[in-house]
């Protein structure tokens, strides 16, 4: 569920305290009504509103926690994390620690708009780090492609999405986590990058 119409286009349009409270109450009521169904809330910085009310991982995790309901969690869309200027691996790690990471969308963009491009074609390094973060938090839920073909054959776009994601997860699987952890303690930044590059 993406609450993207909840937000503002201009200053003073909205009482933010009331808006958050109404959102919290509405989600809590829905979660209580069907406690057997998980409600996964997706955040986005903007579109269709200029500023969406729930626009980053922290706010969405806070809302999910504030409901007090185990069946309320967060959808992490890689492209939305980029657009919000988050580090997707950090967002995955944070949400994974809260046990509120329910669902993952994969796509890519240039951080300026939600272009829904084939994952890894723009931000390959970020994707490998993201895949490793999902592994480290033990994420075993759904990962779905949220890509838009634009001017390309939709079947080809889906094929390439799966090819790129297989490649990304294969590279992440090759990473020696103990070796990486030792290098991160110093940190040996360029030794780390050279090591990851050697696995590509």
Region annotations inferred by a language model:
Residues 1-18:
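Structural motif corresponding to the early beta-alpha repeats
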Residues 22, 34-49:
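Hydrophobic, aromatic-enriched interface-forming segments
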Residues 5-9, 46, 108-115:
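Conserved radical SAM core fold
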Residues 9-14, 49-52, 118-121:
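Short, flexible/disordered intra-domain loops and linkers
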Residues 25-29, 35-36, 54-76, 81-200:
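Histidine-acidic metal/acid-base catalytic patches
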Residues 16, 20-23, 158:
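Generic structural signal for well-ordered, non-membrane alpha-helical segments
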Residues 1-4, 38-42, 142-145:
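Short beta-strand segments at enzyme active-site cores
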């Amino acid at each position: 569920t993406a609450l993207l119409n909840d937000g503002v286009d201009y200053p003073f349009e909205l009482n933010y305290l009331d808006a958050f409270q109404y959102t919290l109450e509405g989600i809590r009521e829905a979660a209580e009504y069907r406690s057997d169904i998980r409600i996964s809330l997706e955040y986005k910085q903007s579109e269709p509103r200029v500023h969406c009310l729930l626009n980053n991982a922290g706010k969405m995790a806070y809302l999910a926690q504030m409901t007090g309901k185990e069946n309320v969690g967060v959808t992490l869309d890689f492209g939305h994390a980029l657009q919000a200027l988050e580090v997707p691996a950090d967002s995955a790690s944070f949400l994974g620690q809260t046990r509120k990471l329910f669902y993952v969308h994969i796509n890519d963009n240039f951080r300026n708009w939600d272009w829904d491009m084939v994952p890894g074609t723009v931000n390959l390094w970020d994707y490998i780090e993201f895949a490793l973060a999902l592994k480290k938090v033990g994420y075993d839920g759904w990962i779905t492609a949220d890509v838009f073909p634009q001017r390309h054959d939709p079947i080809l776009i889906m094929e390439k999405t799966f090819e790129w994601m297989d490649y990304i997860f294969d590279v992440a699987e090759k990473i020696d986590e103990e070796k990486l952890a030792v290098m991160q303690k110093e940190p040996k930044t360029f030794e780390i990058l050279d090591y990851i590059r050697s696995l590509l």
